[in-house]
């Protein structure tokens, strides 16, 4: 079973030991285009699209992945917070599961911070943005957390997490340079660690094919057990 476990929160004050106390001033975010008509916000998120996605995803969430939560109540009911999770599975199921669970149970939108690659893919980039995807840049994260009081989800392992093969499961990859801690401190919001257990088994990667990934211009190309079972 896929199980997401919320661990005790780490507040900005607790994190001071992890990064220098004296931080450079936050750069002013570049102005964004005016929100488009309809229910699409300035980040590209559409609540109508999210509602449709939740309806379509619910059977997978409940019957296939059978997600269970512990301590979701430690996620703030209001105000900004940075959700920090481990990342796994060839096609990561953790991001949509976390976003779906919190939105359904708490009624709060979740914005997923991810690599610019997703935004650049035709069609996929638009769907990604409509469902709460935001390019993972410090200014974007700061604005979401500090100025708008939103929940932002980040996977510090990046693509290195889901690119792991099955024999490397549950071995965390380097969390970048700790930039997410600095952003949370600047924004004055709590960090909510999320431990995802079970995603590694949902779509295990047996091998990677770097040559194919390079040819397609994608971060990695996995050979999965699912491909062998259905292919």
Q: How would you describe each model-predicted region?
A:
Residues 4-101, 105-139, 209, 227, ...:
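Membrane-anchoring hydrophobic helices of lipid-metabolizing enzymes
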Residues 79-85, 113-115, 149-156, 189, 194:
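Generic beta-sheet signal
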Residues 88-89, 158-160:
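Short glycine-rich anion-binding loops that position phosphate/pyrophosphate groups of nucleotides
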Residues 125, 164-168:
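Short acidic, glycine/proline-rich loop/turn micro-motifs
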Residues 127, 143-144, 182-186:
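Hydrophobic/aromatic ligand-binding patch that stacks against planar heteroaromatic rings
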Residues 168-231:
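A cross-family acyltransferase "interaction/gating" segment
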